[in-house]
Every structure is written in C-alpha cells, then in structure tokens.
C-alpha cells in the first residue's frame, strides 16, 4: 500500500519538475488521478464497514486496534485448516461407529435382496428406471464407506440417506404383498430404531460444527477488519501526502502569477458578505490552512486581507467566484422552476375557468328552451 505519489522524486520534492505551465498541469493531473484511486480504496473500506453494520470501526475495531484480537490472514487460514482436519477426524469416528449399525443390518436374514445392485436386465425389470431415479444397495454403500481416494462419504448423514434409499426403492417398486416389500419394511424399522439411539451423537457434532463455523466467521471478520484498519491508516497518510503535493504545485503556480491588487482584495472582502453560512465556513477553513494560529471557531472571527499570503488570496478569489457563480446558477434554476410551476398553475386555473364558463353556457341554453 505504501505507494509513492506518482512521479514523485524521492528526496527531491518538486525540484525535478519544470516550472513550465504545461509540466505543472501534467503533474496536477497525475496527482489528481492518484487521489481518485485513493478515493476508490476508501470507498471499499466504507462499503466493508457498511456491510457489517459498523461505522468508523466498532468494538471489533477497537479490540483490533489495541492488538488483542488481531488475527492475520495466514493464521486464519492455518486455523481453519486445522479446525477442518479435527472436524473431519471427528466425523470419521462417527462413521466408524455407524459401521456397527451397518453390519448389524446387512447381516440380518432379510438383507440378502439388498446386498448388490438390482439385476435389472437379468430379472427383466424393464420399467425399473422409470420408477427408481437413483438405485442403491448395500455393496455400493460399503464401497463408499471404505473409499480412500477422497470420493467416499464426508458426513454420516449421507450414509443414513443412502441406507433409507435402499429400503424406499424396494418399497416403491415392489407390491406391498411381495416378500421384498415386507423385508424392506422390516429392515427399515430396525434401522430407524438403531439410528434413533445414534442420532444424539450426530446432533452433538452438528452443534460443535455450528459453533466452530461461527468462530471461524468471526475470526475472518476480525482479520478483514484488521486489514481495512491498516488500509485506512495508510490511506490517511497518502491523502495527506497528496494534499502536500498539490499545495506545493499550487504555490509553484502562484509564484508565476501576478500579485493580488488592493482592489481585488477589497472585492474579495465584499464578496464574502454574499456567501452562504456553509461557504463562509469553507472560507475560514482555507484561511486556517495557511495560518495555524487562526481560530475559525472563535466567537468573533475577522479576516485581515492584508496579512494573508498570495496563495491564500488566490484560493479565496477562485473559491468566492465559484461559490457566487454556483449560487447564481441555483437561483436561476429555482426562478425557472417557479415560473414553470406558476405557468402550469395559470393553465390549470384557465382550464377550470373555461370549464365553468361552458357549464354556465349550457345551463343558460337549457333555461331558454
């Protein structure tokens, strides 16, 4: 983030730049483009705080600023990887425990029809895939449970779902009066009974995972905020640097300009009387920038034109001109809007008057008849 101001000559300030007007203009354009990029970065920071409902860094930011809860991005990633590894190990333990239920069900005397995939062609079940969307059997489940290549089950609930699918497929395809239907129903009941005793362990793991995910989200937020706090601090420094550069450039320009005349000073003073309260506050800010001892918030404030330096006078001259021009433009727009509104109102009144006249004429004609 510690980019230097574009075109800045380290240790040389503006000495490496020609005093030629075109060179100064080009330099100003470079700095202004750089300021635009800073504003874009600042907007990203503001959007971040807006998205988490915090303005100017809330309690999280305060703790982060104190250094007590700063968590680096790399550390967050390492902690997340460690947490995932521990969670995966816990889930593997659960799936191993579930293996006991699986063996008990598959060793039951009614399990044999479901041990292997249905031989659709051999049994002539031509409509099987029209009824069954996802075939499932115990051998497929066993292979998935024992897979070592990363393609196996990641969660015990996946095994539970496939176990149910075995029985549901059999009950959906076969008639209720068939032996296969009866065996599937009997095994499903036994399986659900055993699962009911096992389920609390799964629910406890879900609670642990939920808490871990909340903590991970909080740590990620802390890391991101720490990054944005650092960015904000650097942006502040760079913006000050940019202001200094622009101030130097302005002084270079002023050095090439003529001095403000006494008449111009008087006109500036008179123009100040026409400014709005907001613009007057900006004027006081301009004076305060050039004169640190000036107190813009004092009860009584006076501006002595004769003691102001040339750069400040030129800034005031241009500011006052722009402020008055904008005020005049705004006034003209309001007058135009008022005239348009007045014209519309007059048309409406005229329209109503004409309607009233026509109505009166109709009544007169009727009375004559």
From Swiss-Prot:
One Pfam match, by short name?
BET
Location comes to:
Nucleus
Give the phenotype of cells or organisms lacking this gene: Disrupted formation of elliptical leaf laminae in mature leaves.
Chief place where the protein resides? nucleus
Gene3D superfamilies from the UniProt entry: 1.20.1270.220, Bromodomain-like
Q: Name one GO cellular component term.
A: nucleus
Q: Where is the composition biased (Basic and acidic residues)?
A: 329-348
Start and end residues of each NET domain: 250-331
From the record, what ranges are coiled-coil? 201-263
Task: Indicate which residues form the motif Bipartite nuclear localization signal.
Answer: 351-368
Name a single GO biological process.
chromatin organization
Which InterPro entries would you find in this protein's record?
Bromodomain (IPR001487), Bromodomain-like_sf (IPR036427), GTE1 (IPR017413), NET_dom (IPR027353), NET_sf (IPR038336)
Q: What is known of its domains?
A: The NET domain could serve as an interface to localize different proteins or complexes to chromatin.
* Protein name (database record): Transcription factor GTE6
Give the source species.
Answer: Arabidopsis thaliana (Mouse-ear cress)
């Amino acid at each position: 983030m510690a980019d230097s101001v574009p075109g800045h000559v380290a240790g040389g300030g503006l000495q490496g730049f020609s005093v030629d007007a075109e060179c100064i203009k080009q330099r100003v354009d470079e700095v202004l483009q750089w300021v635009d990029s800073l504003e874009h970065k600042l907007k990203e920071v503001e959007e971040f705080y807006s998205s988490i409902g915090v303005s100017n860094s809330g309690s999280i930011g305060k703790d982060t600023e104190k250094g007590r809860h700063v968590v680096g991005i790399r550390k967050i990633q390492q902690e997340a990887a460690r947490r995932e590894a521990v969670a995966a190990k816990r889930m593997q333990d659960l799936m191993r425990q579930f293996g006991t239920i699986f063996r008990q069900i598959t060793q039951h005397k009614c399990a044999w029809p479901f041990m292997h995939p249905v031989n659709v062609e051999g049994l002539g079940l031509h409509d099987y895939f029209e009824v069954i969307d996802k075939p499932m059997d115990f051998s497929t489940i066993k292979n998935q449970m024992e897979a070592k290549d990363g393609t196996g089950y990641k969660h015990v609930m996946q095994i539970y779902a496939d176990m149910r699918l075995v029985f549901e497929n059999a009950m959906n395809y076969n008639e209720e009066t068939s032996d296969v239907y009866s065996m599937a129903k009997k095994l499903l009941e036994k399986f659900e009974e055993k699962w009911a005793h096992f389920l609390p362990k799964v629910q406890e793991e879900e609670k642990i995972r939920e808490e871990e995910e909340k903590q991970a989200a909080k740590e990620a937020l802390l890391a991101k905020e720490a990054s944005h706090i650092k960015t904000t601090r650097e942006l502040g420094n760079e913006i000050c640097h940019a202001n200094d550069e622009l101030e130097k450039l302005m002084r270079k320009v002023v050095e090439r300009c003529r001095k403000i005349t006494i008449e111009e000073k008087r006109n500036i003073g008179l123009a100040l009387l026409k400014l709005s309260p907001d613009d007057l506050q900006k004027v006081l800010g301009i004076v305060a920038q050039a004169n640190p001892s000036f107190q813009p918030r004092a009860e009584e404030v006076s501006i002595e034109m004769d003691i102001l330096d040339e750069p400040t006078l030129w800034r005031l001259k241009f500011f006052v001109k722009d402020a008055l021009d904008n005020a005049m433009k705004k006034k003209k727009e309001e007058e135009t809007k008022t005239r348009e509104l007045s014209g519309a109102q007059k048309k409406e009144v005229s329209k109503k008057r004409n309607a009233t006249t026509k109505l009166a004429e109709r009544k007169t004609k009727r009375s004559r008849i």
